Amino acid sequence: MNKERVENAVRELLTALDQDITSEGMRDTPRRVAEMYVSQCTEEDAELERTFVTDKLNDLIMVRDIPMHSMCSHHLLPYYGRAHIAYIPHKRVLGLSKLARLVYSCCKGFTIQEEVTKDVADRLYEELECKGVMCVIEAVHTCMSLRGAKAIGASATTSAVRGVFRDAVAARGEFLSLINKGGPR
């Protein structure tokens, strides 16, 4: 990734939009924007290989309200919200913080919420070889509020279901009720 090229491209974009890039408020904007985009596009691995082996745990494990943000690949604008993940283990469990790291890893680059939701569920299901996974993401998209529909405050909800959650209505219901239950804040 070439930060200097990104900075020059931002400078060119602002100039094409007739913005005074020499003004006090805009002088460092190309550098700041370039740093933001380079940071957003720098991959982070979630390291799901480090697990705890157990035969005793086979009930729902859940982490909710994981803060998330990404950049929409359609408009290059941010979206942000919360991810909720549940899984039923099969011989291995993750440290709970790894679920947050997985979300952050899947949010890197320019992507849409639907892809992030699918990627979180797929990676956890395949790499942990668990019995089932559910991922729900609720997010506010600035592309919806700043352009087009100007739907300020609207949010989008996406879900991905893998394994036993597909057929286990009670387990799905438990997960969804736990999302809405609230908890320590």
What is each model feature region?
Residues 1-185:
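A domain-level signal for the structural core that forms small-molecule/cofactor-binding pockets
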